[in-house]
């Protein structure tokens, strides 16, 4: 549906998959190491469901992350520079109902607007240093670029193709 609405070329997802694997290859602890992956390799991987190919999906895995959250007084005593939480928001919506917007879910747009307002963010592309966005399938990247306000509707794929989300290409919003 995203491809139809945005007129995005079929190889956007392939480019995301290659970029994500190359990013992972820079981390020696990443469980998937494919430093020599190519666009052709992704394009030749078997089709899961059109247009998603096997190498355009994330591998099944379990992971964990931990954060130490403290009051300002304790954070000031930390030997390392703290990262400040300026806003917190959460939204959810049923995954299936008639008329649900699947390309840009309302819950995502509302949640982003809420947390940006709390944190005083007016331009997420310029105001944020990092975003940890779950992209289980390659086509989610351009969709979430739009849904979270990094790009206007129908133009997230252009940021991907320009290299804006690539560390290797010097992108300004590397995911």
Task: Give residue spans per PLM region.
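Short glycine-rich phosphate-binding loop at a beta-alpha junction
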Residues: 128-133
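Phosphate/pyrophosphate-binding loops at sites that engage ATP/ADP/AMP, CoA/4′-phosphopantetheine
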Residues: 3-9, 112-127
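Glycine-rich, mobile lid/loop segments that gate access to catalytic sites or pores
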Residues: 1-51
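Acyl-CoA/ACP chain-elongation machinery
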Residues: 17-31, 92-98, 136-141
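Short glycine/threonine-rich loop-to-helix capping motif typified by GTGT followed
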Residues: 97-101, 135-158
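Stable alpha-helical structural segments in soluble proteins, enriched in small hydrophobic residues
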Residues: 66, 107, 111-120, 140-148
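Condensing-enzyme catalytic core mediating Claisen C-C bond formation in acyl metabolism
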Residues: 11-16, 47-114, 162-175
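Secondary-structure transition/capping motifs at alpha-helix termini
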Residues: 75-77, 119-124, 151
């Amino acid at each position: 549906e995203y491809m139809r609405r945005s007129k995005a070329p079929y190889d956007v997802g392939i480019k995301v998959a290659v970029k994500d694997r190359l990013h992972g290859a820079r981390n020696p602890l990443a469980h998937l190491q494919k430093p020599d992956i190519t666009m052709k390799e992704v394009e030749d991987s078997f089709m899961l469901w059109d247009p998603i190919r096997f190498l355009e999906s994330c591998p099944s895995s379990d992971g964990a992350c931990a954060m130490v959250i403290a009051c300002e007084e304790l954070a000031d005593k930390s030997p390392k520079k703290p990262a400040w939480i300026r806003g917190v928001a959460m939204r959810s919506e049923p995954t299936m109902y008639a008329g649900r917007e699947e390309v840009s879910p309302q819950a995502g747009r509302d949640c982003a607007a809420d947390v940006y307002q709390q944190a005083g963010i007016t331009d997420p592309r310029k105001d944020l240093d990092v975003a940890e966005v779950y992209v289980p399938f390659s086509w989610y990247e351009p969709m979430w670029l739009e849904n979270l306000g990094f790009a206007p509707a129908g133009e997230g794929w252009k940021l991907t193709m320009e290299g804006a989300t690539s560390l290797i290409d010097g992108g300004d919003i590397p995911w």
